[in-house]
Amino acid sequence: MAPRKTVGILGGGQLGRMLTHPAALLGIPLLILDSGSYTPAKQTLLPPPPHSHPDGPFTSETHIRKLASACDILTVEIEHVNADVLEAVEKEGLCEVQPSPQTIRLIQNKYDQKKYLAERGVAVAPFEELPANPTEEDFKAIAGRLGLPLMLKAKTLAYDGRGNSPLKSASSGDIQASLKFLGDRPLYAEGWAPFVKEVAVMVVRNKEGEVRSYDAVETIHRESILRVCLAPLRGEKGVNQRARELAEKAVGHLEGAGIFGVEMFLMPDGELLLNEIAPRPHNSGHHTIEACLTSQFENHLRAILSLPLGSTALRVPSAAMVNILGASSTMDAIDKMADNALTVPGAAVHLYGKAESRKARKMGHITVTAESDAELNERLRALLFAQPDAHADWIDLIAPPSPAPAHSHAKPLVGIIMGSDSDLPVMHPATKILEKFGVPYELTITSAHRTPERMVKYAKTAADRGLRAIIAGAGGAAHLPGMVASETSLPVIGVPVKASVLDGVDSLYSIVQMPRGIPCATVGINNSTNAALLAVRILGTSVPALNKATEEYSKALEEEVLAKADILEEEGWDKYIERLKK
């Protein structure tokens, strides 16, 4: 293997720290420019001999040039760098820069970024530039065009909500309050986006322009700071894929290689609007370290070094990331959250090695993985309730508690549906089997004939909502199981319900005789117990604990039959049959 090129990183914070991990595994020499000799990134990887990690501001021309002279490629862990110097360094042939200085400069100015993307057909919220030193009349005029409320945004040096101020009215008081908050910075206004979810997609791009996206995630903020990411994004059919396509389209219009964090809004009508892009590893991609086949950090290095891009696929069905934020100037709360996470199955702690804590400072994060959304829910609740600012109402919205008995789970793996409430007595045993195995489920009524649109929507959205199997009960014409099977990629198990005529044989024939290409499993008449057991076995192919549980269930059945045989043979069948009559 040829010697790896030396990579210089502008910025020595937590993102640089997490870049050092794959760099060490791949034998990639790193030099890190930041002020201080013991920054988070400098703690975890020694510099290649005979160099030392340079000590100085990552915006300094002198220090950037010195770093460039010792490296083959420069990259960034923060976009607030001197793009002009980076461009000069590259033009002079001192060092390659990735992503390109032009892209970094474009992204540094959020207005220019938004304008550039909008001109290339990327969906964004309506926006307008504010003149320098805007007057109250300027604000009122723009409010008249964009409507109220609207969001005022600083063009530059804005992150974690620090450059955003909502303008709720065109009153002098509200305008002056926003100006005071935003300071003396160039501004633009953006139409209000009443989103239902905030979404992020990590996209890696190599030097040849190939782009690969990771699964979209839901990002949950509190006081404008990212607190939790949930992966993959759940929702209406195709929203994950549409988010990935939008992110890939946007990054495809940029120059240079590396990882990009693309943030967007999911609107009530299902439309996705791009919010902003970061030209570097991003907080919303931290889960990829444990949850994906290749982390965002490794793929960033692969991309800028022209190494083969790694797979972006999830290695687990469900994952989350929880930020560890400082609560005060002491490390007590940080240590408590980290120690608590060590008791949660599937949790991995990442502390950033920052010497000082302060309120709302990002001090670390926790990744948690699980075999299902429901399992993730329980683990996530354990992590969130350990935070010093835990609020039960907020946590319940993110990770709902287990449902009351005989109510649907918020994160089901199996859906139980029936065409009529009269089918409930037949389908009820399925719920008991699923409860016995600890499988979260939902139960509802949808008719193939009386509520066809509801049935189609249920089937089409089932997989994206996290379901992995559907049990459908129907009698008479019994079209529900087959129709659902034709509208979903999930396995569907039909339960023929015995109606008032023909003893359910008509239902059985209807379900079992689906045309070629539309498989629909069918169990015995009125036998929802077997339908549930089959659903558990289907889940067991990917959840080892359920596979083991089904083996134990079968063993218990065997032992039950053997015990009956022993009694029968011991006391005789005449006495045994009398026992049965009782």
Swiss-Prot record:
Catalytic activities: 5-amino-1-(5-phospho-D-ribosyl)imidazole-4-carboxylate + H(+) = 5-amino-1-(5-phospho-beta-D-ribosyl)imidazole + CO2
Pathway recorded for this protein: Purine metabolism; IMP biosynthesis via de novo pathway; 5-amino-1-(5-phospho-D-ribosyl)imidazole-4-carboxylate from 5-amino-1-(5-phospho-D-ribosyl)imidazole (carboxylase route): step 1/1
GO biological process: one example: 'de novo' IMP biosynthetic process
Residues annotated for ATP binding in this entry: 143-200
Residues in coiled coil: none
A Gene Ontology molecular function term of the record: phosphoribosylaminoimidazole carboxylase activity
Keywords: ATP-binding, Decarboxylase, Lyase, Nucleotide-binding, Purine biosynthesis
Superkingdom: Eukaryota
Gene3D superfamilies in the cross-refs: 3.40.50.1970, 3.40.50.20, ATP-grasp fold, A domain (3.30.1490.20), ATP-grasp fold, B domain (3.30.470.20)
Record domain ATP-grasp: where: 114-305
PROSITE patterns hit by this protein: ATP_GRASP
Pfam families associated with the record: AIRC, ATP-grasp, PurK_C, RS_preATP-grasp-like
Enzyme Commission number(s) of this protein: 4.1.1.21
Alphabetized HAMAP family for the sequence: PurE_classI, PurK
Annotated family: In the C-terminal section; belongs to the AIR carboxylase family. Class I subfamily.
Name of the protein: Phosphoribosylaminoimidazole carboxylase
UniProt source species: Cryptococcus neoformans var. neoformans serotype D (strain JEC21 / ATCC MYA-565)
Phylogenetic lineage: Eukaryota, Fungi, Dikarya, Basidiomycota, Agaricomycotina
Primary gene name: ADE2
